[in-house]
Every structure is written in structure tokens, then in C-alpha cells.
């Protein structure tokens, strides 16, 4: 009879901690704690509690963050990795925290509210350099990257019955993007400008992602631009209700954007991601794991080592479809600010950086 899997062993070990933070470790659970309730270290139990700020419960980052928290945790009482137990950092218990998203996460990491966070590479870049959003003139220079995790694909969606064939065709059209502060609007403006499209402010609608699909379905806008891990629920719902098409981001314009802005990468939305959809050439922005420069080097080295332990692969791929993209070979892709020294040490030892 097969023994319990790693997730079951972690659940049992957490009972010995009074269940504290267990919700953040188990997929599908809430993982929500007020900042004041976060415990960094429990001397009595010899446990280090470690928070990972993710995103809204219905998004991609939260389930990936829960899987990440499970992978790097190894509570007291858990069997060692080579005996089928936890392959995380000894005596560390990580929890995934639901948040509003990237901007909140990078601010929270630098201010010490969170031990770490997940954020889009473009938001990380702008935060570090103090350019755009709430970061203008106030750079978060203490921000450091641990790893690039998975791509968040740029989706440009139109109705199948429209006459829009290329990004350049969006000139003078009504376009809906995610709300201001998400990073999507600024990226959308960069992409549109590369194709000679500079819409006036009244032609771009910024709304919560959940509201975007109805605008296109009701023909109140001509196109949607979203950046997210795949599949995107809003796009999936649209594709199941009506026929849609995707506009490619390709050619010299796409290559120029990826060259000029290090957080962009040329990419492809795989065929079959959405009903009846062929492969789509596009750009992607990495979802990356960040910490403060003040985090101890040895701790971040061990966290990076646990993240890329081959024994944790199934944990990372089971939480969400985007988990399939969390791979060591793309760990340094699209990183545009300094690595944390602990992470840098790991990648040098792993041969991904020159020694």
C-alpha cells in the first residue's frame, strides 16, 4: 500500500504547530492573515514562518503561490526529503497570502510587511527604478529577485466577426484593459505605440478583469488586452460563449519591444489553450518571486534550492496550469533588476551563471 504523499505529510506536521498558517500551505484554502498576525519566528517550536504575497484568490498567482509555499516548507516532525518527506527548508513554514497584486506586493516586501512576494517583471522593474505607478521618484532599491516563475501572456482578444486582423487595425477603436495600477495599461500603451496606435484616453477603458469579457460580448469595446497566466478565466468564458480571435504580437515590432524593454519576452500562447484556438505569437511578462535585499543570504539560498529541488516538481505543477512553466531553465528569464545574493549563489553553483 503506498505511503502518504508530501502534501499529506506536511498537513500532519502542521497539526503540531496548532494548525497555524496551515491554510496557506494547502491548495484551495484561504491563506489569509492580517499583517499584524504574521509570526516570523516561534522559539518554543523552533519554527520560522515565512510569508509569500500572491494576488487575488481567483487569479493565477494565488494557487501557484500556495504550491510554492508547500514546496519550500519543511515543518518540524516532517520526514526528510530522501525518505519521501518534505524537500523544503528545515523548520520553515511558508504561507501564501492573498493580496491585490503586484504593486501591493513589492511595496509590502520592501516595507517588511511580507517576507516575499510574487509580481510581474514590468512592475518590479518600474518599482526598482522609481518609474511609473506609485513609484515615480520613490525607487524601491531594496527589491531583489529570487526567480522567474512563469510567463504571463499578453492576450489581445477581438470578436471573430470583426474586421480587425492586426494590432495596427486598433487605431481609433475602443479598447478595454485591466484597471490602472495593474501594469497592463502601461504595457498595452507600449505595445500599441510600437504598431503606430496611440489611442486617446477616452478610447481606453480600465476595469477589473472580471468585467472585461461582458464589454466585448456586448460590443461596447472592440478589443480586450489582458496580461495573465494561462488559461485566463475571462478569456475562457468568452471563448465558450462566442467565437473570438486573437491578434498576434509579432514581427519587428515585437522583437523591438523585447529588446528595448527587458521585462518583455517573445512568446507563444500554445494552441488549444482556449476552444478552437491556434498557436498565437505574442509577448509575455514573467511572474517573478521577490524578496528584500535585507533577507539573509543563507535563507534565500536554501529557499531557492528548495524551489528547484526536482522532488518538488509535482507540487509546483499540480496547483494551476501555469505551474507547468515553472522550470529551472527559465529561472533567469526576463529579470531586469539584481538577484538576491542567496539566489545568485544558487544559480552559480547550478551552472546557470558563470562562477
Kindly label every feature range from the protein language model.
Residues 121-123, 131-132, 162, 198-290, ...:
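Pocket-lining segment of extracytoplasmic ligand-binding domains
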Residues 49-84, 148-218, 313, 318, ...:
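Bilobed "Venus flytrap"/periplasmic-binding protein-like clamshell domains
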Residues 40-118:
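N-terminal (or domain-start) structured segment
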Residues 1-24:
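N-terminal secretory signal peptides and thylakoid transit peptides that target proteins
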